[in-house]
Amino acid sequence: MKDLKHLLYFENLLQEAQNELILQAQSEGKVCVAYVCENTPEPLLNLPGAFSARLRAPRTGSMEMATYYMTSFLCEYSRALLERAIEGGYNFADCLITPDGCTMMNRAVENMELLKALGKGKEKFFFEYMEIPMKADDNGLNLYTLQCTNHILKPLHEHYGIDISDKAIRQAVAEHNRICELIRAIGEYRKGDKPRITGYEFHVITLATYVAPKYLLIDKLEETLEELKSREPDEKGYRARVLVVGSEVDDTDFIKLIEDTGAYVCACLLYTSDAADEGLGVD
């Protein structure tokens, strides 16, 4: 298939944790709210005047320092983040909010705070730790609401003057929903015998929305969606349609490797909340 117009642009956003859109948003005076886990509600991190960026550690090499502090028993992702933080790779962040959904991730962020690895030269920088409910019932909802208020809304307002009114929250939710609509619409082109987008391309596009200011991506996502409507698909050349399931992965080459063997990744629960419905035709 003909290359997508903005694919290289999306790929380049994934090359560095501090990508060009983060720099652009901060030059506009916006606050960078870093996070490390999907249990942190993204819309609340993208209130007017702020934007979210999920921390990554692209091209990680040695993790000796992080392993010293966390041992080799903890997952590579948490150690890679700590290693990059020690190297000074996240000093662009204005705050870091993390949930306790994963002990390893929590420990990584605690080490960042103890080692003063983030926030150099930023007097307003803060760390916040959320308690995540284990049950989706009324008590769990009340706890989650309280945690979001105490560890996201209030700190952002008190430290940076971010508007946390209902109107501001609804605006952020609307923007988040628009991103979700575009991603779902783009993902629809993975269906059918001759899909118009590869699993690798979809992974790259989806991941870009996690690591860059969303409002700066909407126009390119809309253009990509329009482009797919008229994109000529390849003749069926894959041997099987594959659903990949597991923990989140931010290594797009992993999906590319699978597709290079002749498979087609039509759905992946490693980086999206795809439902494996009948239309995806999983083999």
Give residue ranges: language-model regions.
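Acidic/His-rich segments in extracytoplasmic proteins that coordinate ligands and/or metal ions
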Residues: 80-157
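Extended, H/D-rich, highly charged conserved domains that either
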Residues: 181-269
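Catalytic cofactor-binding cores of redox enzymes
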Residues: 122-216
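Short, acidic/turn-prone active-site loops that include or flank metal/cofactor-
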Residues: 56-62, 132-133, 269-270
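Bacterial Sec-exported substrate-binding components of ABC uptake systems
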Residues: 1-35, 221-240
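An N-terminal, globular interaction/scaffold subdomain
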Residues: 40-86, 94, 109
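Gly/Ser/Thr-rich loops at beta-strand to alpha-helix junctions
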Residues: 35-43, 99-106, 243-251
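Conserved small/polar residues in nucleotide/adenosyl-binding loops
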Residues: 271-276
